[in-house]
């Protein structure tokens, strides 16, 4: 069988197109004895170390689909809630409905710069550290002024913490 790969296509600041291709990985879960309720479904607790984070997930065997948010999957039921141990990321199902239409995910065919995960995270880190500098650095003839709610020029927003989902 061929090796399965996951391709992430991303666009930073509506201008920098990134492509990160990696081998597919699955979390190795430990199912615990605790139970809770999410959206009125009886859920069981599971934990794992995955992509540099410790995850806690609540899944329901009432919906026997081994899927969940982001790349969290592989449990004997749908993951309805998941969060990392540092509180940086949290996913909670807000509702479910039956879809009767098919909506394909379309690729626009535009060129994306290929890179590994480390380089991908570096681009995002640069953007979060100085969003305006990231944009104007890519377009030398563009200047940008950030204004407050009263129309007064303010300092460029900087130092937004960047905590990548995958480390």
Model-derived features: where do they sit?
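Extended soluble regions of mature proteins
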Residues: 1-167
């Amino acid at each position: 069988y061929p090796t399965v790969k996951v391709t992430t296509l991303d666009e930073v600041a509506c201008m920098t197109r990134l492509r990160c291709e990696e081998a597919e990985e699955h979390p190795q879960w430990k199912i615990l004895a605790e139970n809770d309720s999410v959206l009125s479904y009886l859920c069981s607790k599971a934990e794992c170390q995955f992509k540099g984070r410790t995850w806690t997930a609540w899944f329901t065997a009432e919906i026997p689909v081994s899927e969940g948010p982001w790349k969290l999957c592989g449990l004997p039921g749908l993951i309805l809630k998941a969060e990392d141990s540092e509180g940086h990321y949290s996913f909670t199902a807000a509702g479910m409905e039956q879809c009767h239409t098919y909506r394909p995910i379309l690729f626009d065919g535009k060129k994306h710069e290929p890179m590994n995960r480390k380089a991908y995270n570096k681009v995002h880190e640069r953007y979060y550290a100085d969003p305006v500098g990231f944009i104007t650095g890519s377009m030398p003839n563009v200047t940008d002024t950030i204004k407050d709610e009263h129309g007064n020029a303010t300092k460029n927003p900087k130092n937004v913490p960047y905590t990548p989902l995958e480390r």
